[in-house]
Regions:
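A structural signal for small-residue-enriched, beta-sheet-centric alpha/beta enzyme cores
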Residues: 1-223
């Protein structure tokens, strides 16, 4: 039904499109529309239940893929950035912290330079006004070899694998292999993984790096 379609879309938006930022600006033309033509031939979904959950799961997967592609297609972008925050006190805090991180111009510039600057991540978390304990927070950068900005599915990476570098542990900066960090962060898709110990909630957000081309593109035309 129209009511359940609207409910599903609003639920999906919270963990997909609302977790995307290219440059922090929202166009007045940004629009999201969902329509159903009835051609699937299934029984109309009029309430929550197994069929609704199946539809919602499929919708979330589709919207997640599209949200990542929006971030990957940012003006002048060379790198897709996914930020995962785990161990937050609630889902809202986890998502908000992740989005604060990927929205930071300094973090975005560091991602362009493949610079493992965890201080900028902590700075963004700090000025967010959100509740977290930096003394029990840890940070990794991870990636997959030969990763691309454009893909159909993007799972969180194992944080202790070949393409992972931990830079901050329980409030203490770590000595780390700078060459490895550069390699990890030079891939086209990079994950910032933040582990808190404030609860059991997780959230994520997607963004991109801030490049010279972004400034050129937006400095060369009038909107």
């Amino acid at each position: 039904s129209s009511k359940m379609l609207d409910k599903a879309l609003h639920s999906s938006i919270l963990e997909t499109y609302n977790c995307v930022s290219v440059d922090g600006d929202t166009s007045t033309n940004d629009t999201l529309t969902i329509m159903a033509n009835g051609l699937a031939g299934n029984k109309e979904i009029t309430e929550e239940g197994p069929d609704y959950q199946i539809f919602l799961t499929a919708l979330n997967k589709l919207n997640t893929i599209m949200a990542k592609k929006i971030a990957a297609d940012g003006e002048g972008a060379t790198r897709l950035v996914e930020c995962n925050v785990n161990g937050a006190k609630d889902v809202e805090t986890a998502r908000a912290l992740a989005k604060e991180i990927i929205c930071s111009s300094l973090v975005k510039a560091a991602m362009f330079g493949a610079d493992a600057n965890f201080g900028r991540i902590l700075c963004a978390m700090g000025y967010s006004g959100l509740d977290f304990n930096p003394d029990t927070t840890s940070i990794w950068f991870t990636s997959k070899t030969n990763s691309k900005r454009y893909f159909e599915d993007y799972e969180s990476f194992q944080v202790h694998g070949e393409n992972s570098v931990q830079v901050y542990k329980d409030g203490v900066p770590l000595e780390f292999d700078e060459e490895l960090a550069k390699k990890v962060m030079s891939e086209e898709a990079v994950e910032i993984l933040v582990e808190c110990k404030d609860g059991n909630a997780s959230g994520k957000a997607w963004g991109c790096d801030l490049t010279y081309d972004y400034v050129k593109i937006n400095g060369d035309y009038r909107t």
